[in-house]
Structure formats: structure tokens, C-alpha cells
């Protein structure tokens, strides 16, 4: 298939395409965005797609929805190489890479069972985001607990 492109999913008219998601993380991206079976958006998910620059990647297409910057940057917690494409009338009108936020609140559960954010107190979890290259770690603002692996397992 030299020189040919394979079309796996039809193009979208308007919406957002999240490309170069770390392989196996597309469902966690949907979780971060609050998209589930009850959502009204048409969503296409491609998993383990061959890619020249990555061993494999996932792709998410969300029709008729443009994501806000906070949502996009939260994706960087689990997919630091993701690229966001804004589509209007079948054309890419905006494209950028995600950039992790400096802090996340209410998105991740602290791994320390004794943390105040895991008790019956009305406290929202809050983490400082620390990045070294593609490696992301989260430090709890209350107890200093560090999550440096399997961040997706700690998503609320």
C-alpha cells in the first residue's frame, strides 16, 4: 500500500479530532471529557492504529463539539503527545498539541487512603502537575502523595 492512505472512519463535518493518543488510553480520554453512553455527541474511537511516529495510537473524533482549553490540556495527563484538530466544514481550522495544566482539581483521586480528600470532608482533590519530557507525575496538594504511574487508574 505504498503511497495510499487508508480511510478507516469517515471524515467529520464539524467537531474535534484528538490524534496521537497513547495507545489504549482513548476510553480514559472520553472519561476525562465526561463523554459516556448517555452523551448526545456522535463519537468515533479508533484504538491501536498503526502510526509512523508511535508504535500504535488511539484517535477520538467528536462530532459537533469543540473542546475548551482546560479539557484539552487535562488530556495531557494520560496522553502527553496528543494533537487536537478543530474541524469546521470538513477542514482543519485549528491544530495544537496538548499542554498539561499546572494543577488539576476534582479529576484525580489521591492514592493515599488517609488524605483529607478521601475522607467524608467536603474537600475536592487537588494536584500539582510535574512534567519531565513525556513523563507526568501528580503531587497531592494536601498530603504530598505522588502519582507517577497509571494516572488513568486514579481518574474520578
UniProtKB/Swiss-Prot annotation:
Its cofactor is Zn(2+). One of its GO terms (biological process) is 'de novo' pyrimidine nucleobase biosynthetic process. Zn(2+) binds at residues 110, 115, 140, 143. Coiled coil: none annotated. Gene3D superfamilies: Aspartate carbamoyltransferase regulatory subunit, C-terminal domain, Aspartate carbamoyltransferase regulatory subunit, N-terminal domain. Belongs to the PyrI family. Involved in allosteric regulation of aspartate carbamoyltransferase. This is Aspartate carbamoyltransferase regulatory chain. It comes from Methanocella arvoryzae (strain DSM 22066 / NBRC 105507 / MRE50). The gene is pyrI.
Amino acid at each position: 500500500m505504498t503511497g495510499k492512505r487508508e480511510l478507516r472512519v469517515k471524515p467529520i463535518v464539524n467537531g474535534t479530532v484528538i490524534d496521537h493518543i497513547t495507545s489504549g488510553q482513548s476510553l480514559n480520554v472520553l472519561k476525562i471529557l465526561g463523554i459516556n453512553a448517555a452523551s448526545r455527541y456522535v463519537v468515533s474511537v479508533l484504538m491501536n492504529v498503526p502510526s509512523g511516529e508511535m508504535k500504535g495510537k488511539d484517535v477520538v473524533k467528536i462530532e459537533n463539539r469543540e473542546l475548551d482549553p482546560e479539557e484539552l490540556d487535562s488530556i495531557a495527563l494520560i496522553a502527553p503527545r496528543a494533537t487536537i484538530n478543530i474541524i469546521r466544514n470538513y477542514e482543519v481550522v485549528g491544530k495544537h498539541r496538548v499542554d498539561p495544566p499546572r494543577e488539576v482539581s476534582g479529576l484525580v483521586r489521591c492514592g493515599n487512603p488517609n488524605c483529607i480528600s478521601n475522607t467524608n470532608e467536603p474537600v475536592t482533590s487537588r494536584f500539582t502537575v510535574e512534567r519531565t519530557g513525556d513523563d507526568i507525575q501528580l503531587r497531592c496538594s494536601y498530603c504530598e502523595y505522588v502519582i507517577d504511574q497509571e494516572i488513568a487508574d486514579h481518574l474520578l
